[in-house]
Structure formats: C-alpha cells, structure tokens
Regions:
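A glycine-rich (often HGG/GG-containing) alpha/beta subdomain
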Residues: 1-134
Length: 134
C-alpha cells in the first residue's frame, strides 16, 4: 500500500463534531500542509489548530488535530484525525480541499471498509475482530 487514504469517519453531517481520518505514508505531510506548518505537538494528544486550504490559504475550520505514528495506530500506518465542526458546509469544504490535494500526494478517498482492511493487513486486528465490524 503506497497510497494515503482519507474519509469522514464519524456520522454524516450535520453533527456537533465530524472526524476526518487520514491514513498512510503521506498523512503527516498532509497534516503539515493543512496546518500551515504549525508545530505538530505530541503524538496521541489533541492540539487545536487552524485547518487551512493549501490551494488558497483560506481557513477552513478550527479543529482538534491528532496524529498516531505507525505502527501503533489503529491501521498500523501513520494516521491523522481532524475533529472539526460537523456542519455540512465545513465538512464538505475540508473533504473537497483534501480531494484537490490528490495531485500533490498519492491521496484518495477511502473505499468502504478500507481502514478496517488496512488494520487487518497490518496485524492490528484479527479476522474475528474485522468480521465483527462488518
């Protein structure tokens, strides 16, 4: 797996909070790009950061940003989570901005179940656990 994937991991908007997950080898570079080079902070801890659209520099939202280094993440890969406001416009703007970065990174939207598949393939969950999530 050389590509990096992203998806809305929480329920569909509108909601109070939306969780957008990014997993793969370029997830930390994407985090740096969207936080305009702000200091990452410590792994596994939430940090308040502005999410900035790399295309035009517009602030998309203020979000809690977390990163989980491989191999200790849920997928076994470098993983980033953005906990942003769950309104439809904000979620769509963030997902659209990620899509626009697919030319800069080996980045694409995750297929259904792909985070689980990567967790299984990287030994983070066994077959019984994977089937339990289906």
């Amino acid at each position: 797996m050389t590509d990096t994937i992203y998806a809305l991991s929480s329920g569909r908007p509108p909601a109070g909070i939306a969780v957008i997950r990014i997993s793969g080898p370029q997830s930390l570079a994407i985090l740096d790009r969207f936080t305009d080079g702000a200091r990452r902070g410590k792994p596994r801890r939430a940090h308040l950061r502005s999410l900035v659209d790399p295309a035009d520099g517009d602030v998309l939202d203020q979000a809690l940003v977390l990163f989980f280094p491989a191999p200790g993440s849920v997928t076994g890969e470098d993983l980033v989570e953005w906990h942003c406001h769950g309104g439809q416009a904000i979620v769509r703007a963030v997902l659209d901005a990620l899509q626009r970065q697919s030319g800069q990174f080996a980045l694409r939207e995750a297929r259904p179940g792909e985070f689980t598949r990567r967790a299984f393939e990287n030994g983070r969950i066994d077959l019984n656990e994977a089937e339990g999530l289906a």
